[in-house]
Each structure stands twice: as C-alpha cells, then as structure tokens.
C-alpha cells in the first residue's frame, strides 16, 4: 500500500481512514503498538497527537493495556480507561455536538476530560527520574489529578449492539467469542485481568 501510494481504507466502504471522525484502537498487547503506529502512517494521519490540529479525526486508544497508558500517550488524543460500553456513546455524542457547532479540538478535549474513564494525555506534563522511570504527571488545563476508570454497573442493562458491521474476510482462527462474565472472583496477584476488570460482572 505504501509503495503504491494507497492510503489505508475501511474494508466495508472503501472510505479513507483519515476521513473518519474517530479512529479507535484496542491495545490488546504491547507488541501491537508498532502496528497501531504503522496503521496511522498508512492512513496518512500524523502519528503524534500534537501534530493533529483539526477536530477530526480523533485518535482514541483503549483496552487492557490502557491500564498503563504512558508508553503511547503522545500518540493518542484520548485514552479510554476501564470499560467502554457506556463511555463510548458519551464521547461520540460529544464529538458530534462539537463538530456540528464548529468547536475546536481543544474545546472537545476540554469537555471530554470531565467524562469518567477518559484520559487526555496532552493535559498532563510528565517528568522523569534520572533512571528513566516516571516521577510525576502534573495536570494542566484544569484536568483531574486522578482519572477514574469507567465501570459498567449492570452488564445486562448497558448498551450493546444487536448486529455488527464485520469485514467480509476470514476471521482469526475461524472462531466466535461470547462473553458471559467479566473479571474473576479469585483475584490472583499475578493476574492482570483479575484486577483491572474489577468489580466482577456477570451477563445473564
């Protein structure tokens, strides 16, 4: 694609990714971070959030690895912390409102930072120790000192799509996934999922 000057496009419609209002990535594994940057580059979207001045596209990250967001903070406009079923619709409604009223990206981010579970990296100044470890994140622009993760209180009542738009290609391992519960009642100290998906939730 890069050699032929073909920008990354949506499988379903063929529309260029850079023309979307929001581009979202699930950070499932740390080793996929370079793939995220490669996709942004293929799409013709500037990699760093500071280089993207217009309101859209908003580049959003989320998923399990968002519990440690700093390695990718400079590339994301917003990062979803916690469970995204309810937060996603709130953010999309806000983005639609800002786009229709002609507001800037800065105004969108200043409103989004007040949504529980939304971390806006550009509103925090990081400082590091001599050994390279993070010393502090200092909030700016009135951002909260602590960003609390989003929690779905009732998995049976939260929004979930009834039908999915899926690409017309073979799926990985030819399998389907059904979530019957989230998290774990055991809380083993070595297990990330047992802690980041608390409190335990069940879908019936």
Regions found by a protein language model. Give the residues of each.
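Generic structural "secondary-structure junction" signal
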Residues: 47, 67, 120, 149, ...
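Glycine-rich beta-alpha loop elements in corrinoid/cobalamin-binding modules
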Residues: 2-138
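Homeobox/homeodomain signature
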Residues: 7-13, 69, 108, 145-148, ...
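Short, exposed beta-strand "edge-strand" segments with a Pro/Gly-rich flavor and a Y/T-containing core
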Residues: 12-14, 97, 101-102, 146-152, ...
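Radical SAM [4Fe-4S] cluster-binding motif and immediate context
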Residues: 152-204
